[in-house]
Amino acid sequence: MDYEDIEKLVFGGGSNSSAARASVGEITEQEHWLNVMKALKLPASDVARVRDEFFGGDIIDRNLLEFMRSLKPKRKVGAISNAWDGLRAYMEREKFADVFDSIVISAEVKVAKPAEKIYRIALDQLQVKPNEAVFVDDMPANIEACERLGMKGIQFADAESALKQLKAIL
């Protein structure tokens, strides 16, 4: 099994998949990883190792976080993430949860992007109107959804171009 196959097990599989169910809080992240391990025919005792190897190449963009942190004195900064129930603890452990005035995690609110409700939750928490908000995401469907609400959308391709677009809007 190659990386793409494992990535499909971890993140893909459609709306009834283990990943999708974990993303809206129907199952926990731990239950999802146990499902992945079962599909890989690996023992549950190897979950931590497999998870750490899978995410081992991920890098937190500290420059991007510092830019967002620099906005906070004058602007509200929020995050909307289609993520499992462990994200908030991860953000706190890695010391960047404080960058955000609001963090909306799909597993916690039981709805995922591109559903309108998740954007509305974030807007309500930040106490801003859609036309006052800028949303950055890598998925075109999520950008289209935010724009339908009246938010400005920036499709993330790389940090440099996203920052350039964001600075132009702000």
Q: Where do the model's predicted regions map?
A:
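Short, acidic loop-to-helix structural element flanking the phosphoryl-transfer center
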Residues: A44-G78, E116, A159
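Surface-exposed alpha-helical segments enriched in charged/polar residues
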Residues: K38, E66-R69, D124, E144
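Secondary-structure boundary motif
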Residues: K38, L42, S70-P73, R93, ...
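A mid-sequence interfacial segment
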Residues: R62, E66-F96, F100
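Active-site phosphate/pyrophosphate- and oxyanion-stabilizing loops and adjacent acidic/basic residues
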Residues: L34, R69, R120
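Asp-based, Mg2+/Mn2+-dependent phosphohydrolase catalytic module
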Residues: W84, R88-L170
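N-terminal helical cap/lid subdomain that shapes the substrate entry/recognition surface
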Residues: M1-R62
